[in-house]
């Protein structure tokens, strides 16, 4: 995809963004994506509150889109009417794009309200099923600048041919080194046990880490830089095929387990400590580059100083010291 093609896509993105009220923008993220395994459908996915709202892409040079799944109508009957307008197959490709860009601010508000309801829905077991995805979207939105000492997020919910997927993928610079960060995010107790536990995700991430072709991410990085007018333009882009790779476990919303006001959804120090110790045991003598990151909440930047990013062993020591206090 060349710069002219990306500009066409981004003009549509700008039109849509102008219809989204400021209060909602924190929880949206336009993510560079290839919509098929052959990389013939290249474009962007709009995530809102963790859910996939829209795929906007080029196919054989023609701009097209697909929209949210019909199942979201259970959270709002009104958005199903908007969906019916958008999936109308009549007219040329240009007319279909015109229908998309003509959706009003009021209708976009209905759509995003429905996605927020989906994210905050509590099932019969009193567990918020998509809370992490909602916060994950905000983290991706917040971390779009490519600066020394920070991780720039270039993709979320990335999936490869073997089906393994990190929550977020980022790029960072450390002196003269460029590093691809495969990030697994945890912020609730429900995501710390069973198949969702950190150690199980570590096993999956190792497979992804070895299987996924970093060249794909080079394209995502370039598109992300163009989209955000980043100083790291594609002309100066880095060869991500030869980038160093790391696995990162990111934790937020950690509370004191002795605090009586602690909600069941929030992580405790012990939750995180147990999870990281299991990772350490699974790592054994491997040379995998695994980092642990801590942020207060989804509004914080992903800084890579030693207060936020640590080795597995240092994270264990830090958490054990917190438990003693």
Describe the role of every protein-language-model region.
Residues 1-325:
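Charged, terminal alpha-helix-loop-beta segments
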């Amino acid at each position: 995809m060349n710069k002219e093609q990306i500009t066409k896509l981004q003009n549509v993105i700008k039109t849509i963004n102008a219809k989204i009220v400021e209060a909602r923008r924190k929880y949206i993220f336009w993510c560079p994506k290839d919509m098929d395994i052959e990389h013939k459908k290249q474009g962007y996915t709009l995530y809102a509150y963790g859910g996939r709202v829209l795929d906007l892409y080029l196919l054989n040079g023609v701009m097209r889109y697909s929209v949210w799944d019909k199942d979201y109508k259970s959270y709002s009957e009104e958005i199903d009417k908007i969906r019916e307008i958008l999936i109308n197959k009549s007219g040329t490709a240009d007319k279909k794009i015109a229908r998309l860009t003509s959706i009003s601010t009021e209708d976009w508000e209905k759509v995003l309200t429905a996605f927020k309801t989906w994210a905050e829905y509590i099932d019969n077991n009193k567990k918020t099923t998509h809370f992490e995805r909602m916060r994950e979207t905000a983290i991706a939105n917040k971390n779009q600048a490519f600066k020394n000492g920070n991780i720039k997020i270039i993709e979320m919910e990335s999936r490869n041919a073997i089906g393994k997927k990190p929550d977020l993928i980022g790029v960072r610079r450390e002196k003269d080194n460029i590093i691809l960060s495969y990030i697994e995010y945890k912020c609730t107790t429900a995501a710390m046990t069973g198949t969702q536990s950190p150690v199980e995700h570590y096993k999956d991430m190792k497979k992804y880490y070895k299987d996924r072709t970093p060249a794909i991410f080079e394209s995502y990085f370039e598109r992300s830089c163009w989209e955000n007018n980043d100083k790291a333009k594609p002309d100066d882009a880095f060869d991500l095929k030869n980038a160093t790779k790391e696995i990162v476990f990111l934790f937020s919303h950690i509370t004191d387990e002795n605090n009586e006001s602690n909600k069941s959804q929030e992580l405790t120090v012990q939750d995180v400590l147990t999870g990281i110790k299991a990772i350490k045991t699974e790592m054994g003598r491997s040379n995998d580059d695994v980092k642990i990151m801590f942020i207060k909440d989804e509004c914080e930047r992903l800084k890579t100083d030693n207060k936020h990013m640590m080795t597995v062993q240092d994270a264990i020591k830090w958490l054990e010291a917190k438990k003693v206090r």
